[in-house]
Amino acid sequence: MKTGQRCIVIDAGHGGVDAGTSSADGTAEKDINLAIALNLYDFLNICGIDCKLIREDDTEFYPNGEDRSRSDLYNRLDYVNSIENAVLVSIHQNHFSDSGEWGMQVWYTANVPSSKKLADNILNNTKMFIQPDNTRSNKQSDDSYYILYKASVPSVMVECGFMSNPQEVSNLESSAYRKRLACTITLGITQYLNEGEY
């Protein structure tokens, strides 16, 4: 498989004291993010793709357990920038006042044009295999998505589903469903790497 020696840096959003958003039944976004990220890490390894996890457990990201005066996001970005030939895939969940909203959506950095292709590959595979009725489109990030806005490497943020939608939360709480999501994200990544336009 052609990977161009790229390293996929997997960011499980939030962690530790930062739970992210949550569902009506109290399920924390940080836990769903980590579970999907760990599945993604396993699938990428099976495919022979170099990858790293920013966090592997329920913690904030402070390298070497120190320098807590700096924000978690600054540290994550510094870590990504320290990896040669990195491609950032950040895993998150969405939330909205309308509990009927559902489905994956992927944000991408404007700083590296090929990021849009990566985002499109991920969403298209998810629509094909899991969410055929999903009508969402991917979006270019603005400054409210700091890690994407400041990214200097190909970067996407995968909003896997809505924590405000009870049915989608039920899906996201399922280990089998999370593995299916991780599989379609993996397919999108492998297509992107094989296209070699980064």
Regions found by a protein language model. Name each.
Residues M1-I8, G16, T21-D25, D42, ...:
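Extracellular cell-wall/glycan-interacting regions and their flexible linkers
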Residues M1-L118:
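Catalytic-core regions of hydrolytic enzymes
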Residues D18, S69, W102, N134, ...:
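Glycine-rich, flexible loop/turn motifs
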Residues E29-D31, W107-N111, N124-M128, S175-K179:
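Short, low-complexity, polar/charged sequence segments that are solvent-exposed and flexible
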Residues N75, N124, S170:
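Charged/polar, solvent-exposed surface patches and flexible loops
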Residues D78, I83, S90, S97, ...:
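Active-site-adjacent mobile loop/cap segments within catalytic or ligand-binding domains
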Residues S114-S141:
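Active-site-adjacent substrate-binding region
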